[in-house]
Amino acid sequence: MSHHVPNLYGTPIRDPHERKRNSASMGEVNQSVSSRNCERGSEKGTKQRKKASHACDQCRRKRIKCRFDKHTGVCQGCLEVGEKCQFIRVPLKRGPAKKRGSVVSIEKFSSDNDPLQYRPRTHSYPMNSGNNYLPSLARNSSFPSISSLFVPSITAQSQQFVKVPYDDIKRRSSLAILGSDSSISTEFGGNYRLDENLNVRQEGKDIVAKGMITPVEEMGACSSNVRRQGSQSLPIQEQRASPYINPFISGRSRLSSLSYTSEATTSEGNTQGKNQCMLTPNSVRSIEKERLNSLTAGFPNKKLGTDGRSDKWDKNSTWKPVYRSSNPSHPSTEKNVSLNQEASAKPLMLGTYRQFDATSFYKVLGIYYNFFHINFPVIPINKSKFTDMLDPEKPNVIDEIRQINNEIIQCFKTALEVLVFCKIKQRRSSKSTKSWSRDSLCDFQKGLYYIQNFNKCIADCFQSLITIKPVLKQNSSVIPSRIKFIYFSTIIVLNFILILAGEESSLLLGPSVGVFNEFQAHKLFLPFQNTSPMLLLNSNEESGDEILDYAVLFKRLYILLNILDTLQSFRLGQPKLINLNFGSAIETYFSDKTGHNQVVEKAPVALDNILRNLKLGEFITYFVLNRKSLQVNVPHHLLFTNQTDYGEFAVEKGEHDNIAGKFETLLKKKEILIRKLLNIEQKNDHILENCCNSDAEMKNIGELVCSMITLVSGILDSITNMNAENSVDLDSKPLPNAYFAQDSEEELMSPTQSITSNLASEENTRCTTKDLMGTVSIFMLPMVEECYNIISLIGPIPTTLISLYIRNGNMAKGINDRIMTLSTALNELVQITALFNTLEPFRKNAHDRAKRYYVSATSSTGCYESVMKSMYSGKCAASNASNVAPSEEENKKILKKFADIGWKLMDDSELGCCCCFFN
């Protein structure tokens, strides 16, 4: 019998089961209320900010107003200075800690507004049940969120590109992306490998076509990826935290092709769970455009017979081209049919399908011809002829050869984009209307990527060229000469980029010379070239209705490589890799005498400047080959009596008006000054015994030094007026409005051609500094380094001579005139110092000042002795003067100091000019 407790308050007691049900219902209500609060908090976090309190990190650090643009995802301040607009810093406010949902929303908001971490939004499109198009890009990610992978804190000094890796998955459709015309540089970000211990199941091997990595994932793999998110997040963050150390020491290139996959790369690509790929911001945007185009154009999703072909190429990397055969009993008929079907289904590379990308590339090509070609023709052919070479629609080209052609053209596009994007000047003022960042946000992001991954892009592009080389050599007889010309032009462009940037390593120059020698390019200059077949030459091919002499074009490329080798030897003091004597090759192969079809530049003024710069490279080649350091065992009397013959490089009338002629004259006078200063040390006692001899020697040295200072001042002034930063300034030259016009018979003219077209009939076709405003020259860095070294060494000579003349009194007639000339030289030295401060970016690549001097060989004054003097120490020791008067003791010290300057000038000539010197 149960006893009930009396109810003292007169309220009925409910059943305990009913109480339990009520408590459960209250819990559901509380849970729904809390969920609504969380949703409200997350909506509040993702809401666009309206106040200046949510400024980005850069604007907060500079204490300026942050004008954020929701369309571009970048504030106005960061866009003008070219910095990364990011919201990493979490504002510390008073009060209780924020909820977890708001913090996540802030991170998500910061990642969405990050221009380098740009991810286009995915939408759902109406799709037919029978067609399987590309799924959304958001489902291709194998991690929980992109914002959770942002590990390092990026500073303005060293910004690393935030790479978004994706799973390597099997492509199932969209032939439009296979025919993409986007640059191969979008694949450079794919050189990213996750940890092998992740054991991520891969749905197939990756397929890289035309430089675009296409991640497509099956619908059923999404759920499995969600289950693996927790186990993958930690190792992914650890891998992303390690930056690239040296891309030249990296392993194999990520570039793999269906047509020339090497055995090592093939075995690596066939292993499941080993490779991972990622997309750059530009490739993500390109894929989204391809999706939209494929959906609107209605491309059918057809499965082509690519499995048999890919297996065949995977097993045999050095494939043979298969010709079409009309015999139905031929065993390769079915494979040919499938290849032909796929080739017909692919969109054209430069056709109307990718009109935007084609226009963008021709814009880059136009920038090259306007700003680079006029000083050094890396592409030794005029713009109209080279544009015809890029057209993939050429007759008698089979499918396999067409695929190789497309890969080579993509490599060239990548190299040219790296050259242009890395040299474009970013304006820091809002007045600029042609800044690259204002032209297109996508181009701005691509430029930042190329700058931050400069060495990696160069290394990957050159590695892809090396991968193509065996196939190109084996099928040289069927591959068109125009494609081989583009292939070797790409090698020249890559070396040009490194030398222009001041790189001090020859890791790319040596293999490049080896590739040219492997194709026997040097035999083009030999008289018995017709006795054996040439790998580079086929029969002359028609370009339109005209015939191009590709032998002349390949000779030009080899001469350009020789000049690039000369510049490296001139700067670094290393031996030349090409020692072939070309004779007067510039006038023979680059002038308009070769014919109108293969002329380097049609504008007479631009062609004149090109020939001048190339002749300067030819003179520096002769200058380098006649170094005294290569004749260490020569007797000491021949060291000073032998005079280098520069008769064939005599300066013509009017050559001093241009920078190339001034620099050539400066090098000649430098050699004369070295010989005079070293002769002083040899006959020191004879000079001191006769005052007349001493006065004559001082007069000659003073005049020579003053003329050299005047030349240096003119060279630096011309460089400052032309382009002080040696970068592309889009405001200095207007670009044409249209870069790409299909089926247009009218030729597009560059600004240089349009300006100078009326001057063709005039007698004076000389190129002036005004015509070179804003152009980029590869000779500027060696010029500035050489001028800096010369001024650092000969700068004290005018002051020393003035003090000598004043102390000795009227030793000869015309002392006052000499002192006035030396005083004028001192004023020019002050102007030169100001010009060097303007040209400070050129000196950032300088070596350590004391690199070329032996540390142990120091004098009592702390000055380092010359390397060349140490080499010839036993051969050219100065004899001691006997019975020297006390008044001549100071003169002896001065002459000895001049001799030391001569030795250090010889160091500059013999050991390279890329470092500075102490007096």
Swiss-Prot record:
Subcellular localization(s) per the UniProt record: Nucleus
Family matches, as InterPro entries: Carb_Metab_Trans_Reg, Zn2-C6_fun-type_DNA-bd_sf, Zn2Cys6_DnaBD
Gene3D superfamilies given in the database record: Zn(2)-C6 fungal-type DNA-binding domain (4.10.240.10)
Keywords: DNA-binding, Metal-binding, Nucleus, Transcription, Transcription regulation, Zinc
UniProt keyword annotation of Iron-sulfur present: no
SUPFAM superfamilies: Zn2/Cys6 DNA-binding domain
Region (Disordered): 1-54, 297-338
Coiled-coil features, chain-numbered ranges: none
CDD domains, alphabetized: GAL4
Pfam families: Zn_clus
The UniProt record lists the keyword Lipid metabolism: no
GO annotation, cellular component aspect: nucleus
Molecular function (Gene Ontology), one example: sequence-specific DNA binding
Biased composition (Polar residues): 23-36, 318-338
Basic and acidic residues biased stretches: 37-46, 304-317
Top-rank lineage group of the source organism: Eukaryota
DNA-binding region(s), chain positions: 56-85
Quaternary context: Binds DNA in a sequence-specific manner.
Family: Belongs to the EDS1/RGT1 family.
Protein name: Transcriptional regulatory protein EDS1
Lineage of producing organism: Eukaryota, Fungi, Dikarya, Ascomycota, Saccharomycotina
